[in-house]
Amino acid sequence: MMARPVLFVLAGVNGAGKSSIGGHLLQQAGLSWFNPDTFARELMAATGCGQDEANAAAWQEGVRRFDAAMAERSHHAIETTLGGRTIPARIMAATRTHDVMVWFCGLATPELHIARVKARVRAGGHDIPEASIRARYPLAQANLIALMPQIAHLQVYDNSVEVAPGQVVPDPVLVAEMIAGSLVWPVDVDTLRATPEWAKPLLEAAISLQAGGMAASE
């Protein structure tokens, strides 16, 4: 039997650092991905259009490329907040034809996401309305939990640590990993107790999913 194509998903609310984390992993694997922020920025520079128009065009282009890759049954990589409806629904549909691998990056609070986005704006990046970030924060987790039973491989990272300017930025902390519905990290009680508050609903969902799978196999 031929191996199924893979859909790589870099997920997390704006400001989480998903591009830095997942992008590095994809580059190590020799893969590229559609980054809507980069697309929007390049479109604005090339055409002089406004931020809203560029964001809309980037979103539409991302959906177009996604749909084309799914139809062709080819490998694909995307970046998403998971805080909407359209992309999570498409990812769910893709699990029928693709092995879906998700790297989800989160921060302790919506306020920290907002602060990171503001810092990015000061460095020349584009802004995201605070209301959008606050709305996406709970939706992203809810959508991830809904996808969990169908995800082939999931890694959840905490990227909340703050450092002073000029200091070395620490690597994000792996707080959960699932492979085919089985929780493989954390592996001990002490590590489980160290789970950050924001990620506990995800761990609880993963543990519940695994327990349900074990009960069904008995």
Predicted regions, residues:
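Conserved glycine(s) of the Walker
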Residues: 17
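P-loop (Walker A) phosphate-binding loop of NTP-binding proteins
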Residues: 13
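Short hydrophobic/aromatic beta-strand immediately N-terminal to the Walker A/P-loop
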Residues: 7-9
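Phosphate-binding P-loop
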Residues: 1-4, 69-70
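A glycine- and Lys/Arg-enriched "phosphate-lid" helix/loop adjacent to the NTP-binding pocket
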Residues: 98-144
